[in-house]
Amino acid sequence: REVSLEVPATVYSAEGVSAGETTVAIDGSVKILGDRSFEGQFAIHEVETTCREGVHANIRWDAMWTGAQDILFYRAGEFCTLGVERMLYITENMQSFGLRLEDGTIITTDEAYVPLLMSGYYYSIRPIFSNQF
C-alpha cells in the first residue's frame, strides 16, 4: 500500500530535554505480506542529509528479531551513513515513531519513546497504537 504522510515530531537533546519541533516526510510503499517493510522517502527535516535528492529509506518490522524495527538509508548503489542510528521504534501505520541520531539527539512523535531511546538498549516491542477507545 502507498503511504504519503507529513508527521510532526519533537526533537530532544541527548539528555532528554525538549529542544524543538521538526517534521518527517514519509512517501513510499509498505509491504505487509511476508517480510513487512517500507521503501521510500523518510526525510527528517532536522537531518538535512535524509532530505537529499535520491536518498531513500528501507524500514523493516521484525528486522533482526521479532519486535525489532530498523532503518537503512541508501542511494542508488550505496548505503548511506547519515548520522541516524539503525534501530528505531515505529508503528506499522508510520504515524508514531522514535529514533536516535548518532550524537544522541532523539526525534520522536511521542514522549514515551524518550526513555527507551535514552537507555541505549532496544527492547523487543511491537508499538501498536489504536484509534479505538
Predicted regions and their residues:
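Alpha-helical transmembrane signal-anchor/signal-peptide segments
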Residues: 1-14
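A mature extracytoplasmic/lumenal domain signature
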Residues: 11, 46-48, 129
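Extracellular/lumenal and peripheral-membrane lipid-interaction modules
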Residues: 14, 33, 106
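Short, solvent-exposed secondary-structure boundary motifs
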Residues: 14-19, 78-80
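Extracytoplasmic/periplasmic/luminal assembly and interaction segments
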Residues: 17-69
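Non-cytosolic head/periplasmic domains of membrane-anchored proteins
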Residues: 52-133
